[in-house]
């Protein structure tokens, strides 16, 4: 019998021991739900009537998640610029390609920008995706200024009447201020040609608690408007709670 089934069975009989509560707490924390939120869940369950325990948990967990409905794919009659950001290895390039593929299904004219000019084969990876979708792509020389690539792409997208510009950026540690400043420069340069409509932070959900620190710092640096969560697990709830309403 699963942990929660045992819990709900025990609640209905009014017989949850102190050791069982400790086990439940440890299991939830190990699932990366976060200490604060785990304690809130347990308190809600303890204070609920036995028959209301399931509803108490689901209602409380849902309250941590945003219920604000928002369409990511904006006004297709104008240029929409979407910047993809995040630390190394989270899946930014693949996520960029998936977004591009989704947009082309609605007959939108999409341009990709390979602004990750530092990672080996990053440009080639995005070029491969661009060829498969297919969509056009703007690239730069290896180790060239990412802001320059972004600006060239923004110029092309604006003058050639693209509906969407998706910019894949280099992975950067959120603890490196110089790299975060460089990302801010990319945003400033793009806005000379067109407003940045969305800044999407890609987070590998298996990073656990560190995902919160990543989210907070990227929000402060460039004003994140949304998240792409890869390798999804309970971390989504934990990250979502302190970063609402993003």
Residue ranges of each PLM-predicted region?
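Primarily NTPase-proximal linker/entry elements flanking Walker-type ATP/GTP-binding cores
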Residues: 3-115, 121-143, 147-158, 162-167
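Conserved nucleotide-binding/hydrolysis micro-motifs of P-loop NTPases
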Residues: 79, 117-120, 143-145, 171-174, ...
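Short beta-alpha junctions and helix-cap segments that line functional grooves
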Residues: 99, 213-214, 240
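Conserved beta-strand/loop subsegment of P-loop NTPase cores
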Residues: 111, 166, 195-203, 220-233, ...
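Conserved ATPase-coupling elements of RecA-like P-loop NTPase cores
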Residues: 122-124, 174-180, 211-212
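Inter-motif core of Ras-like GTPase G domains
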Residues: 181-205
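Active-site/ligand-binding-proximal alpha/beta "capping" segment
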Residues: 186-188, 211-228
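Single conserved hydrophobic/aromatic residue that forms the stacking wall/gate
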Residues: 238-246
């Amino acid at each position: 019998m699963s942990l929660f089934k045992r819990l709900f069975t025990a609640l209905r009989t009014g017989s949850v021991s102190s050791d069982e509560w400790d086990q439940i707490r440890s299991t939830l924390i190990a699932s990366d739900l976060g200490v604060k939120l785990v304690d809130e869940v347990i308190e809600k369950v303890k204070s609920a009537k036995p028959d209301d325990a399931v509803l108490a948990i689901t209602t409380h967990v849902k309250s941590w998640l945003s219920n604000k409905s928002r369409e990511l794919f904006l006004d297709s009659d104008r240029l929409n610029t979407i910047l993809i950001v995040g630390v190394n290895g989270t899946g930014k390039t693949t996520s960029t390609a998936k977004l591009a593929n989704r947009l082309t299904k609605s007959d939108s004219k999409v341009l990709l920008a390979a602004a990750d000019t530092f990672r080996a084969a990053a440009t080639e990876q995005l070029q491969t995706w661009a060829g498969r979708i297919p969509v056009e792509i703007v690239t730069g020389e290896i180790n060239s200024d990412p802001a320059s690539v972004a600006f060239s792409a923004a110029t092309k997208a604006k003058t050639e009447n693209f509906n969407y510009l998706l910019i894949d950026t280099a992975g950067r540690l959120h603890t490196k201020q110089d790299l975060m400043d460089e990302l801010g420069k990319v945003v400033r340069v793009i806005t000379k040609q067109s407003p940045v409509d969305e800044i999407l932070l890609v987070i590998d959900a298996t990073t656990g608690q560190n995902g919160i620190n990543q989210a907070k710092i990227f929000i402060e640096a460039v004003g994140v408007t949304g998240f792409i969560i890869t390798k999804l697990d309970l971390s989504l709830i934990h990250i979502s709670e302190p970063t609402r309403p993003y």
